[in-house]
Each structure stands twice: as C-alpha cells, then as structure tokens.
Amino acid sequence: MNSLKNLILIGVIKSCHGIQGHVILKSFTEPSTKILERTLVNESGANIRIKLISQNAKGELICTFNDIATRNEAENLKGYKIFCLRTSLPKLEEDEFYIADLNHLQILDQSNKEIGKIKNILNFGAGDIIEIEFLDKTTELLPFNKEFFPIITKDYVILNYQTKV
C-alpha cells in the first residue's frame, strides 16, 4: 500500500460517455495523453488499466477503464481519482514544483511573517490560480506567477502582495 505522499494525482474521471462503459478522463498532464505513459494506480496503490478511445475538443480523454463495460458501471466512477507513483515522474528543474507539493504550504509575507497557507491550486484554462487561506480563515485568489510569489521553496512561499491582514 502506498502513502498518499508517494502518489501524485494526475487525473480524475469526470463522467461516463456513451453506453459501452466509456469514461471521460480529465488529465492533469501536459499534453493530456501523457497520462497514458505512466503506471496508473488508485489511492490504495492498486494498478488501473486505461485504454484511450478518443479525445474530445476540450482535450479530455475518452477511455475504457479497467473492466467497466456498461454505462451504469461507468456512472459510479464519477470523481474517481487517478494517481501515479512519485518515483515514476521526471526530475524537476529548479523553480518547478508538482501541484501536490504546493498544496497546504505555509505562506509568508515579505518580512517572513506567516499569513496563511495555500488552500488550493486551480486552473480554469488561463493559468494556475492560488487560493490562499489567511490566518483569519478568509480566502483570496491570486495568479500563480513570480510577481505575486517571488520565492517558492519546499517548505513555504513568499507572497508579494498587500493583504488585508
């Protein structure tokens, strides 16, 4: 069994497609078909078999999943998370991070005072957006770029932004 720290979320089943048990897979890899080059597992570390059928205009993959053969079976998979082993991923360049490593990181201001944490990382198609949860539990969305986040380490990020805190 694998710890979730050893797994990287790289896709999620969005919905079913058609009557033959096909699913729409939202891949978090770039390009989206790169997910098929990895050994895929579920949260427990059990292998997952996915076969590409086609790709839709949104870049989502239409696939067969394990031995699912009917629409009813496929409907039960909505939201199913797909992982790969961290050790199977390529080494990152300096200033590159996996989203899984940034989630919940401590956020410091320019004077190294803790002001909150990264609550979530979102992408609606125009780039990554960081959802910040401040110490007072309020949240704010900011673009993930060097202007707002000039320093990123494995333990914390520095926020260059005048907050209300």
UniProtKB/Swiss-Prot annotation:
Question: PANTHER family, from UniProt?
Answer: RIBOSOME MATURATION FACTOR RIMM
Q: Name one GO cellular component term.
A: ribosome
Q: What is the annotated signal peptide range for this record? A: none
Coarse class of the primary localization is cytoplasm
Q: Summarize subunit and interaction data from the UniProt record for this chain.
A: Binds ribosomal protein uS19.
Q: Quote the gene name from the UniProt entry.
A: rimM
Q: Which species expresses this protein natively?
A: Rickettsia prowazekii (strain Madrid E)
Annotated GO biological process: ribosomal small subunit biogenesis; rRNA processing
Q: Does the keyword Transferase apply?
A: no
The name under which this protein is listed is: Ribosome maturation factor RimM
Q: Could you list this entry's UniProt keywords, alphabetically sorted.
A: Chaperone, Cytoplasm, Ribosome biogenesis, rRNA processing
Task: Kindly list the GO molecular function terms attached to this UniProt entry.
Answer: ribosome binding
Subcellular localization: Cytoplasm
**Keyword Lipid biosynthesis part of the UniProt annotation:** no
- Which family is it part of? Belongs to the RimM family.
InterPro entries linked: PRC-brl_dom, PRC_barrel-like_sf, RimM, RimM_N, RimM_N_sf, Transl_B-barrel_sf
Alphabetical list of Pfam families matching this protein: PRC, RimM
Q: Domain PRC barrel spans what residues?
A: 94-165
State what this protein does.
Answer: An accessory protein needed during the final step in the assembly of 30S ribosomal subunit, possibly for assembly of the head region. Essential for efficient processing of 16S rRNA. May be needed both before and after RbfA during the maturation of 16S rRNA. It has affinity for free ribosomal 30S subunits but not for 70S ribosomes.
* Notes concerning its domains: The PRC barrel domain binds ribosomal protein uS19.
